[in-house]
């Protein structure tokens, strides 16, 4: 897949403070790439540099192998969608979508044709004459996206666009966004702190921490093979266990809990159950390892967990192949 954007040893300083130390990243044409990390990790600053709203202190940004550091945002063939959609309250959906084209002196006929297609793709045709105050949060978000894609951008940049929505609507729109990206075939660069959001939508995820990239990979790679201690603790749940000079991560679903009446395997330790949590179709056991004093998490089905009570002595362990060594 062709690389559309290259970030080459880019740095961003604010005064004496280094927000992003040298950072490099290749973004493929047509992919859904998510930049994921906690608040203050530099993800929005990176997005704003790609968009042209911030200038790199050092390094180069390339679009189709052309340096764009000094190119203004409106010449980059990119559009940015913010969490707060900035819709014009006095304009209808259709007029909001057409506003940018009107400023660019696009003919009325072409405005109508392109707006029609954008509204069709975002399922807004029936709302074309409504004003933002008469729309739900999800509909407003779709208007913001329609307004962005109507200009046929090469890249769509999205800065936590679902952050202000309730859980159910957010889940529905995650699916809509991914389907929209597939239909459009354009590159999406999506910024979020929500790991579940990143996992459900992305082709690849860039995990950031303190201005650095910790890991780049597919959702499955990030989940199953975290490379660093930060990724292992930030993405999903992991048991982090000291192993010599370093650490290994074991997902709770790979930790086995057995009765003390069963023959013990050499990899298993004696422990006792400190707590049991109901988590939907599973139960989460918290087991204190008597040998290491580690508190381990293990998932079991409700049927499997029915045999246990808080305080029970058990054997706890896992297969070596389920350990992931961390840097």
UniProtKB/Swiss-Prot annotation:
Record-listed E.C. numbers: 7.6.2.11
GO cellular component: ATP-binding cassette (ABC) transporter complex
Signal peptide residues on this chain, from the entry's feature table: none
Alphabetized SMART domains for the sequence: AAA
Presence of keyword Transmembrane: no
Subcellular location: Cell membrane
Reactions this protein catalyses: ATP + H2O + polyamine-[polyamine-binding protein]Side 1 = ADP + phosphate + polyamineSide 2 + [polyamine-binding protein]Side 1
A matching Pfam family: TOBE_2
Record's keyword terms, sorted: ATP-binding, Cell membrane, Membrane, Nucleotide-binding, Translocase, Transport
One Gene Ontology term of the molecular function aspect: ATP hydrolysis activity
Quaternary structure (record): The complex is composed of two ATP-binding proteins (PotA), two transmembrane proteins (PotB and PotC) and a solute-binding protein (PotD).
Biological role: Part of the ABC transporter complex PotABCD involved in spermidine/putrescine import. Responsible for energy coupling to the transport system.
The protein's name in its UniProt record: Spermidine/putrescine import ATP-binding protein PotA
Species name: Bacillus cereus (strain ATCC 14579 / DSM 31 / CCUG 7414 / JCM 2152 / NBRC 15305 / NCIMB 9373 / NCTC 2599 / NRRL B-3711)
């Amino acid at each position: 897949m062709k690389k559309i954007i290259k970030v080459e040893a880019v740095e961003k300083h604010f005064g004496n403070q280094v927000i992003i130390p040298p950072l490099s990243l290749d973004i493929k044409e047509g992919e859904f790439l998510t930049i994921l990390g906690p608040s203050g990790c530099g993800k929005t600053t990176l997005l704003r540099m790609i968009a042209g709203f911030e200038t790199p202190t050092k390094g180069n940004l390339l679009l189709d192998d052309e340096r764009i550091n000094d190119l203004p945002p409106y010449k980059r063939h990119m559009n940015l969608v913010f969490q707060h959609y900035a819709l014009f309250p006095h304009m209808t959906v259709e007029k909001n979508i057409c506003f940018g084209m009107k400023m660019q002196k696009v003919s009325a006929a072409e405005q109508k044709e392109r707006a029609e297609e954008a509204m069709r793709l975002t399922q807004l045709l029936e709302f074309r004459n409504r004003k933002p105050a008469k729309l739900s949060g999800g509909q407003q978000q779709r208007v913001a996206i329609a307004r962005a894609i109507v200009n046929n951008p090469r890249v769509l940049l999205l800065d936590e666009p679902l952050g202000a929505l309730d859980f159910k609507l957010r889940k529905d729109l995650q699916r809509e966004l991914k389907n929209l990206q597939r239909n459009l075939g354009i590159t999406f660069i999506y910024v979020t702190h929500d790991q579940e959001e990143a996992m459900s939508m992305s082709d690849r995820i860039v995990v950031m921490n303190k201005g650095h990239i910790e890991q780049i990979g597919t959702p499955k790679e990030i989940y199953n093979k975290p490379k660093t201690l930060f990724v292992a603790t930030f993405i999903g749940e992991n048991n982090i266990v000291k192993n010599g000079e370093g650490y290994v991560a074991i997902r709770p679903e790979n930790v086995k809990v057995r009765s003390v009446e069963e023959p013990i395997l050499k990899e298993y330790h004696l422990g006792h159950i400190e707590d049991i949590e109901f988590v939907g179709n599973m139960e989460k056991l918290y087991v204190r390892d008597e040998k290491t004093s580690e508190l381990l998490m293990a998932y079991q089905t409700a049927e499997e967990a029915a045999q246990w009570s808080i305080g029970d002595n058990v054997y706890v362990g896992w297969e070596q192949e389920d350990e992931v060594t961390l840097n």
